[in-house]
A protein has these predicted regions:
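C-terminal structural segment of proteins
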Residues: 2-5, 9-167
Length: 167
């Protein structure tokens, strides 16, 4: 089924497995879905606890494994930064580069995020790596979690509500 415009789940099957190139890691999905809402993604994950949630894929590319289901969040509308009266709502799929160059966010936070991502690899990487993936991965070389903690950030999780970031 492929019907993204109505918010339905997209099911795509790959007829042949991806093979390793020059001995590098390969992540393979037996089945791939692209839900249109976070609720659909959550329900799919509840049905299959061995599923892999796919965001920017920067950290997942480091693994060499097969997953029964890949749940791609790119159709869920999580790639926006929204400003409310007293806060910024940052979607999990917002890239580090988007946040780094968001002028109103940078002004409101005295440029803390620009400083936090400055030493992360390069511009190309920051334009692909997501805020949600960075929070989930908690890489030791990344100051992103520290910056978000300093800003008293809370996360909103589908099915669990709003909560503070726990270091």
């Amino acid at each position: 089924m492929y019907n993204d415009k109505r918010g339905e789940v997209i099911h795509l099957r790959y007829p042949c497995p991806i093979t390793k190139k020059q001995g590098g890691p390969v992540l393979t999905f037996e089945k791939y879905v692209r839900p249109g809402t976070t609720r659909q993604a959550y329900e799919l994950l509840q049905e299959n606890r061995l599923a892999t949630v796919i965001g920017g894929m920067m950290w997942l590319r480091l693994s060499d494994r097969t997953s029964p289901l890949g749940i791609d969040l790119s159709g869920c509308g999580l790639n926006k930064v929204e400003e409310t009266e007293d806060a910024f709502r940052i979607g999990a799929m917002v890239t580090l580069g988007q946040l780094e160059h968001h002028e109103r966010f940078q002004a409101a936070t005295c440029g803390i995020f620009t400083e936090a991502v400055r030493d992360i690899v390069g511009t190309q990487f920051r334009n692909l790596a997501s805020v949600g993936g960075s929070l989930y991965a908690r890489m030791g070389f990344s100051d992103i979690v520290t910056a978000l903690l300093a800003l008293d950030t809370e996360v909103e999780l589908e099915g669990a509500g709003t909560m503070p970031i726990i270091p």
